[in-house]
Structures are given as structure tokens and as C-alpha cells.
A protein has these predicted regions:
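Generic alpha-helical secondary structure signal
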Residues: 18, 57-71, 80-83, 113-116, ...
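Generic structural concept
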Residues: 29, 33, 63, 67, ...
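Basic, alpha-helical terminal appendages of large translation-related enzymes
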Residues: 13, 75, 80-81, 90-174
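Extended, non-catalytic structural segments that build the interaction scaffolds
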Residues: 14-28, 68-87
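Catalytic adenosine-cofactor/nucleotide-binding cores of aminoacyl-tRNA synthetases and other
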Residues: 1-57, 150-170
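Residues that form generic nucleotide/phosphate-binding pockets
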Residues: 2, 23, 65, 69, ...
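Conserved, charged catalytic cores of large soluble enzymes
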Residues: 10, 36-73, 97-112
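A short, ordered amphipathic alpha-helix with a cationic face
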Residues: 6, 59-63, 117-120, 132
Length: 174
């Protein structure tokens, strides 16, 4: 991951243990791992571990962000700019973390409609992040699907509730 994310294709790069640990902690532990954990724990606490996803709750802002991310991702892959493809994936994860902070789902217990909307949008983002990561981090992608209790093929996401299994994906390197 570090080499793909941190060093542009066809260019020289610099590797150090310190840079590796910093990238791992920033991208994987703090950003992605924390996001997956936050969403799973929220579903566990607010929905007793089972969440029924519904496409009707997906916001245009989120839909546009996901579509735009896929377009940039594919363009980056077409141009062999793997570091930019991963940058787009983590930009989507950043967006989701800001979405959590902005909408504060833990405080929406008295507004179930808005809570469903917020959690649906977070699920949509995480499912797309998992798919986007598949070529680069296939095990991580599978673990995200597993934590969310989502089918890896995406065929039945709206047919049955997600059964979350919260766990830490990336422990921090100290």
C-alpha cells in the first residue's frame, strides 16, 4: 500500500520506516479504519447491529461525490497513476468522516428518518470505498464488507439488512 500510495508510478521514491508508519497511521488506522469502526459501532448501538439500507435515502451530494470519485479513479487507472487512484479513494473516506462529524448520527435518536438517511449515506460511501480498494488492498476490502455484514458481490444490499460485526481493521503503529 505504502509504495502504491506514496510513490508515483514511473518515478523514483523515498522509503523510510518513519514515512511508512506515518502513512499507515494517517490513512489506514486513523482515516479508513476509524471510519469503518465508527459506522459499525453506531449501527450496533443505534440499530442493535442490524441496518436496512434503502437507496431512497441517498443524498444527491453523496451520490455526486461517489460518481465523481469513480470517474477520477478510473481516469487515474487508465493513466497508470495508481497513487492518484488511491488518493481519490481516501478523499472519499475523508468526505465520509466529515459527513459523520457534520451530521452527528449519535445525536439523532429523536429523528429516525434523518438517522436512517445519514447511516444509509455512510454505508453507500463505505461500500464504494471497499470496491475501490479491491485492486489494491483486496483483504482490506473483504474485511470492510465483513465488518458491515455486506455481501461482497453487491447483489443483495437492498434485499436484507446489514448485520455489522465491529472490529479494528488497522491497529495503530506506536
Amino acid at each position: 500500500y505504502y509504495l502504491l500510495r506514496g510513490i508515483p508510478s514511473y518515478e523514483d521514491g523515498d522509503f523510510s520506516t518513519e514515512k511508512f508508519e506515518a502513512r499507515y497511521n494517517a490513512d489506514l488506522a486513523n482515516n479508513l479504519g476509524n471510519l469503518v469502526s465508527r459506522v459499525a459501532v453506531l449501527i450496533e448501538k443505534l440499530f442493535n447491529g442490524s441496518f436496512a439500507y434503502s437507496r431512497k435515502y441517498v443524498l444527491k451530494e453523496v451520490d455526486d461525490k461517489v460518481i465523481n470519485t469513480w470517474k477520477k479513479y478510473i481516469e487515474s487507472l487508465d493513466n497508470f497513476k495508481l497513487h492518484l487512484a488511491l488518493e481519490n479513494v481516501f478523499s472519499l473516506a475523508d468526505f465520509a468522516n466529515l459527513f459523520v462529524d457534520e451530521h452527528k448520527p449519535w445525536a439523532l435518536g429523536d429523528n429516525p428518518e434523518h438517522l436512517n438517511e445519514v447511516m444509509t449515506n455512510l454505508i453507500v460511501i463505505l461500500l464504494n470505498v471497499a470496491w475501490l480498494l479491491k485492486p489494491f488492498l483486496p483483504e482490506t476490502s473483504n474485511r470492510i464488507f465483513e465488518v458491515l455484514g455486506a455481501d461482497k458481490d453487491g447483489k443483495s444490499w437492498e434485499e436484507k439488512p446489514f448485520q455489522v460485526r465491529p472490529k479494528i481493521l488497522f491497529p495503530k503503529i506506536q
